[in-house]
């Protein structure tokens, strides 16, 4: 069983201190050890990033874009290799892993437009012989802390754009599935990224706290659970750091009586059970307007849930792999137990699911609850597993109130043929991302990603235009070149045109 390394100042750095096991969730076996950085190791990465910043910030944006474009090409050329690593350590299917990587590459493509997105604004003759302009300048050393569920995509939300903007970066990926993240960072260096511009440090809370406490780190981007997002936001902002912290979710799909039910069912199957439900944009609640809609939905869902193809993620032709860890498997099982105990109707039970030849894997089958109510734990909390809850309401207004009353506000969607209902829903619903006849309203790379309420801590969303704003500071410059042979008297009144 090999041990992974940190990537600091362009070099692989061994660490003989604390470590954690990385598991193959399909077999339950430990396959690697990942080092957990102490303060000394983290400081090496901070020092490397700090030393690299002056030269990188002064590198022309077009030169930065050339490195990013070569990086994009290398990612595409290594898709199969990266996808296999994701699947081995996370458990998601190879097809799902490849899709994750493709969405990440879209963010690299957006970052390749650095010469355009960093142009700033210019105004000539704002006053007599006075010109003014504003531009985007990098912050300095910035950091990202990323979750296990998208080991390729979420880091690619962060550091390509941060680096394109002229910053240097320290990435603390999830210790559960770090190999693909490390390989991708190596490919960035292969593309010509200078040493120290991107550093990868593995770790746990000690490393997180070190980044929060380091005065050299000017901004932190985080994706993960709400309690940790809240902690990172509070600890970072009280030290004067810029922080964007994306937290948990409880995403609802509203099904209207006029919905195309066959298309809605197909959408819900992928959104609820894809990646074993381990997505912050997973649909975990289906809100049916009317009993007739709910009954018809369940009748169509049940056979499809029971027919899900489940197995080792690296096998071909699957719908779903295992959960990421034994702890995750136990937690989701506990939620199913809770739903039964609190009176929800368990229509399909995924507990105890086993895959032949992989009896020690962290598998669950798809589960479906009906007649779930808002006071139940399975409705209130993020399950992060292959569990779909059906809630019955009598009107669109009741469905909207249900969603607006929930503490999370990440994403939601509505299935309807009624344009008036869809427009009302988009206007009045209190979440950050809305889909109309689209199950996973994940924006493309040139729009920003993020929720409302307790799904986001901070003022700016991830990637896209908000990403540029997060990783830069605006500087306004006013210059005057007096005409020759002229002298202007002192002006004591407030200057005006």
UniProtKB/Swiss-Prot annotation:
SUPFAM superfamilies: ALDH-like. It comes from the Bacteria. It is an enzyme of class 1 (oxidoreductase). Pfam families: Aldedh. Induction: Is subject to regulation by the transcriptional activator BauR. GO terms for molecular function: methylmalonate-semialdehyde dehydrogenase (acylating, NAD) activity. Keywords: NAD, Oxidoreductase. Disruption phenotype: Cells lacking this gene grow normally on glutamate, putrescine, cadaverine, and GABA, but growth on beta-alanine is completely abolished. One of its GO terms (biological process) is thymine catabolic process. It catalyses: 3-oxopropanoate + NAD(+) + CoA + H2O = hydrogencarbonate + acetyl-CoA + NADH + H(+). The active site is at residue 280. Its EC number is 1.2.1.27. InterPro entries: Ald_DH/histidinol_DH (IPR016161), Ald_DH_C (IPR016163), Ald_DH_CS_CYS (IPR016160), Ald_DH_N (IPR016162), Aldehyde_DH_dom (IPR015590), MeMal-semiAld_DH (IPR010061). NAD(+) binds at residues 148, 172, 175-176, 225, 382. Involved in the degradation of beta-alanine. Likely catalyzes the NAD(+)- and CoA-dependent oxidative decarboxylation of malonate semialdehyde (3-oxopropanoate) to acetyl-CoA. Belongs to the aldehyde dehydrogenase family. NCBIfam families: MMSDH. This is Malonate-semialdehyde dehydrogenase. It comes from Pseudomonas aeruginosa (strain ATCC 15692 / DSM 22644 / CIP 104116 / JCM 14847 / LMG 12228 / 1C / PRS 101 / PAO1). The gene is bauC.
């Amino acid at each position: 069983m090999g041990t992974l390394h940190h990537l600091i100042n362009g070099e692989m750095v061994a660490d003989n201190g604390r470590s954690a096991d990385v598991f193959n969730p399909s077999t339950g076996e430990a396959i690697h050890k990942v080092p957990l950085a102490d303060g000394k190791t983290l400081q090496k990465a901070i020092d490397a990033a700090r030393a690299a910043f002056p030269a990188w910030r002064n590198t022309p944006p077009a030169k930065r874009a050339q490195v990013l474009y070569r990086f994009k090409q290398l990612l595409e050329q290594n898709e199969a290799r990266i996808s296999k690593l994701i699947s081995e350590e996370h458990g998601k299917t190879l097809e799902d892993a490849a899709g994750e990587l493709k969405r990440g590459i879209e963010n690299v493509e957006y970052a390749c437009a650095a010469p355009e997105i960093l142009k700033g604004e210019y105004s000539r003759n704002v006053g007599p012989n006075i010109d003014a302009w504003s531009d985007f300048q990098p912050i300095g050393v910035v950091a990202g802390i990323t979750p296990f569920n998208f080991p390729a995509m979420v880091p690619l939300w962060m550091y390509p754009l941060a680096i394109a903007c002229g910053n240097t970066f320290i990435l603390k990926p999830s210790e559960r599935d770090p190999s693909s993240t490390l390989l991708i960072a190596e490919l960035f260096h292969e593309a010509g990224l200078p040493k120290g511009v991107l550093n990868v440090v593995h770790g746990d809370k000690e490393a997180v706290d070190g980044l929060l406490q380091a005065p050299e780190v000017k901004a932190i981007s985080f994706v993960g659970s709400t309690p940790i997002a809240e902690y990172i936001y509070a600890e970072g902002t009280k030290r004067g750091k810029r922080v964007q912290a994306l937290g948990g979710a409880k995403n609802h799909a509203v099904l209207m009586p006029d919905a195309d039910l066959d298309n809605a069912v197909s959408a819900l199957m992928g959104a609820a059970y894809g990646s074993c439900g381990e997505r912050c944009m997973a649909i975990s609640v289906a809100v049916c307007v009317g009993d007739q809609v709910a009954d018809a939905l369940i009748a169509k869902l049940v056979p499809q849930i029971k027919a899900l193809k489940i197995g080792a993620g690296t096998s071909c032709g699957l719908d779903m792999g295992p959960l990421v860890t034994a702890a995750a498997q136990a937690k989701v099982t506990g939620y199913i137990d809770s739903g039964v105990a609190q009176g929800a109707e368990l229509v399909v039970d995924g507990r105890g699911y086993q895959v032949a030849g992989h009896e020690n894997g962290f598998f669950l089958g798809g589960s479906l609850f009906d007649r779930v109510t808002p006071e139940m734990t399975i409705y209130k909390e993020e399950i992060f597993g292959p569990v779909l809850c059906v809630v019955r309401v009598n009107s669109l207004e009741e469905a909207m109130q249900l969603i607006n009353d929930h503490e999370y506000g990440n994403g939601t969607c509505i299935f309807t043929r009624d344009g008036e209902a869809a427009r009302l829903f988009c206007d009045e619903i209190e979440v950050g991302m809305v889909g109309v006849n689209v199950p996973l309203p994940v924006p493309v790379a040139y729009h920003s990603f993020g929720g409302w309420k307790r799904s986001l801590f901070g003022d700016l969303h991830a990637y896209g235009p908000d990403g540029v704003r997060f990783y830069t500071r605006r500087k306004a410059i006013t210059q005057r070149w007096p005409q020759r042979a002229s002298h202007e008297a002192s002006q004591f009144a407030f200057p005006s045109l």
